[in-house]
Structures are given as C-alpha cells and as structure tokens.
Amino acid sequence: MGTHVIKMPDIGEGIAQVELVEWFVKVGDIIAEDQVVADVMTDKATVEIPSPVSGKVLALGGQPGEVMAVGSELIRIEVEGSGNHVDVPQAKPAEVPAAPVAAKPEPQKDVKPAAYQASASHEAAPIVPRQPGDKPLASPAVRKRALDAGIELRYVHGSGPAGRILHEDLDAFMSKPQSAAGQTPNGYARRTDSEQVPVIGLRRKIAQRMQDAKRRVAHFSYVEEIDVTALEALRQQLNSKHGDSRGKLTLLPFLVRALVVALRDFPQINATYDDEAQIITRHGAVHVGIATQGDNGLMVPVLRHAEAGSLWANAGEISRLANAARNNKASREELSGSTITLTSLGALGGIVSTPVVNTPEVAIVGVNRMVERPVVIDGQIVVRKMMNLSSSFDHRVVDGMDAALFIQAVRGLLEQPACLFVE
C-alpha cells in the first residue's frame, strides 16, 4: 500500500489561489477513479476536482471556506502499489459560475483551518455524541426540513462525521412516535439558540460584488408608474392564439423588446464603465442580464443579442437560461458579458425597489408587481393594470435627465405596445 497526494491544480487564467467550497468525501471514504472529491471556486467559476486514482481517503487538506494556494496539498489517498506519488489533477469546470454564483455553504462550528484533517488509524471519522447545549451540526437543507416539520435538531441523533445530522437521521427520527422521539410540544417559550453560518462560496462572491458595487458606483434610482393594461391584453391574446404551439409569453420578453428599442436613442445607457482605465464602452449589441434567484443565490444569465431575437425566440431563451441558472447548469459564458440587466421579483415585486447596478454595467431596470388600481383618465375614474419600474443608474456615466428620458421612452413603448414592433 502507498500514499497518493493530490495537489490543488492550476485552474488557469493566472489564478494563484482558490477557495475550497465543499468536500464530497470524508476521511475513511473509499473513492473511485475520476470521482469528484471537492468543489473549489475562482473569481469566475466553480470547478470540480476529480481524483485520478481510486483508494481510501487518509486526509483532507483544508476546510470549506479556506483559501488555498495552487500547488498546495489538497487530499491524501491510500492506494494499491508503491504510492508516494504527487499528482495535480485536471480541474473540471462545473456548470456554476462564481459571481454572481456555487455550492451552498454548510454551517460549521468555529473551526480553524488546519493543514489537513487526518485520522491516526486512517479510519472514517467517528460519531461524536452531542453534549447538552451543543449546537447540532447539519446542512442548510436538513435544517430547513427540520424547521418545516417542527423538529428541534438537538433531539436528533447524528450519524455523520463529528455527529453531523444527515437526511437519513432526520428520516429515522420522523418515523418514530413523537413520545418515543422525545420531541417537546410546541409552545410559547424563550429561544436562546443561534447559528453561525460561514460566508463562503457563492455567498462570499455575492457579498463582495454587492459591496464593491455600492462602494464604487454613484447610484441613483428613478421610479416610473406604467399603465400596462393594453400590454397585458396583447400578451393574453397572443398566448390564447399561439401559446400552445409557441409557448406562453410572460411580460419579460416584452420588457426586453422595450429596452432594445429605447436603447437605440440612449447608447450611453447600453454601456460598461472601466473606472480604473477611465473608459466607457458603448455596445451595439444588447446583451440583457436576467437576474434570477436560485437555491444557491442570485445569478444573472445573459440573453445575448436581444436586438436580433423575435418575441418568441427571446422568450424561449429567457426561459432556458433561467431554468439553467436555477438548476446550477448555466455555463460560464451564459453568465457573463451583459450590457444591461433586468430584474424582477414577479408577484413579490412590491411597489418600489432600489436595485444595485450590476457592474461594470451602468444601468439596471427593476420590475415591480402589477396591480389593478383606480386611475383618472379624461376626468373619469377607471380601473387599470398598473406597474412600476424601479431603475438604478451609475451617475458617473448616466445623467439624471438621460435616465429619466430613457425610462419615459420605455414607458411609452409598454403603454402603446404596437410601437414595440414598428421599425
């Protein structure tokens, strides 16, 4: 028997260090050749690290959230043969970019990063019984299941490493009678528990980007009320006539079309700003970022060349991109290169929002909830479908008057939807 050492691979693009996001193995596990053992994250992508050999895991070289240098020891594996071989595997890009975007972090007790974790006997980590008052270890998914089921995790025995509670442990607990499980009845009682969640992986990248955007960009926001009664009637008519054959239309492809048409007269808004080089790049192509909330956080897949797509073509591509982002299947290319971003919370859109500019872009258009409201038209009170657009701009590049005129142009197109299709 011998020892096979895998080192952190060179991801490319001149990257000297990466963040260890998640382990898929633990000390004592038997793994196969090409099995993915960990996810690591660069500034641009989450990358899967496969094992080039099969064997038994002896030691792990870091904790999730730890930043590791390229070439540092990642994992030790006991293998058949002489061993003593140091290997740098080929990293496999995962279909999840890093920013705005990776694996969901798991809560950890205050663990100091170690050179590596190893068992003296090279056996699997033992189950450590929880002492009264200790915070139970469990992944966010397990905690959510327990919360939804009204179960306090301190009553659940964990069979994972260091007493971590697994889905199987929760299933076993839920299969027991309530009295046998020792579950206390729900009531009005004081809670003293708290949870510390490490900011790692995707959440760290989102935090960094949001902080950077708010610190560097001179944000200003503009809100406009829009009567979308005619637009909604057109959308429903098109869906009724063509929905079965072409797919149902949401409001998003109409909003994209309105941006494309309006941007023809406002090239300074379809732009990116390099504030270090002091260069504004005005783009002919309209690449619309579609802000999408997934289980792992916010991602912005990009609808490329929206100016060249028909209403249904753009609708289909928006749907495909959003599904890919939600399922962590979007490629790195599909999540980069936007020139303006559209963000919508749908039915949760609220009345007003102040979205954060997706740098290096200079504008983001936010869509709020559509509601029926009484409005005055020609001296008469009528019920109309109304919706607000809440948009933010980089005031270093976009003047307030230009921003207002741009949103007014979008408003005119949405209120008179026939104009969307007049060249």
From Swiss-Prot:
Q: Which residues form the Lipoyl-binding domain?
A: 3-78
Name-wise, this protein is Lipoamide acyltransferase component of branched-chain alpha-keto acid dehydrogenase complex
| Residues in the signal sequence | none
Q: Which reactions does this protein catalyse? A: N(6)-[(R)-dihydrolipoyl]-L-lysyl-[protein] + 2-methylpropanoyl-CoA = N(6)-[(R)-S(8)-2-methylpropanoyldihydrolipoyl]-L-lysyl-[protein] + CoA
Q: What class of enzyme is it?
A: transferase
Organism, scientific name? Pseudomonas putida
TM segment ranges: none
Q: Which GO terms describe its biological process?
A: glycolytic process
InterPro entries per the UniProt record, alphabetical: 2-oxoA_DH_lipoyl-BS, 2-oxoacid_DH_actylTfrase, 2-oxoacid_DH_E2_comp, Biotin_lipoyl, CAT-like_dom_sf, E3-bd_dom_sf, PSBD, Single_hybrid_motif
Q: Which UniProt keywords apply?
A: Acyltransferase, Glycolysis, Lipoyl, Transferase
Q: Does the keyword Glycosyltransferase apply?
A: no
Active site at H395, D399
Identify residues that carry N6-lipoyllysine: K44
Please report the stretch or stretches of sequence annotated as the Peripheral subunit-binding (PSBD) domain.
Answer: 137-174
Task: Describe its assembly.
Answer: Forms a 24-polypeptide structural core with octahedral symmetry.
**What EC number(s) does its UniProt record assign?**
2.3.1.168
The cofactors named for this UniProt entry are: (R)-lipoate
Note how many cofactor molecules are bound and how: Binds 1 lipoyl cofactor covalently.
> What is the role of this chain?
The branched-chain alpha-keto dehydrogenase complex catalyzes the overall conversion of alpha-keto acids to acyl-CoA and CO(2). It contains multiple copies of three enzymatic components: branched-chain alpha-keto acid decarboxylase (E1), lipoamide acyltransferase (E2) and lipoamide dehydrogenase (E3).
Q: Name one GO molecular function term.
A: dihydrolipoyllysine-residue (2-methylpropanoyl)transferase activity
Family statement? Belongs to the 2-oxoacid dehydrogenase family.
Name of a matching Pfam family: Biotin_lipoyl
Provide GO CC annotations from the record: cytoplasm
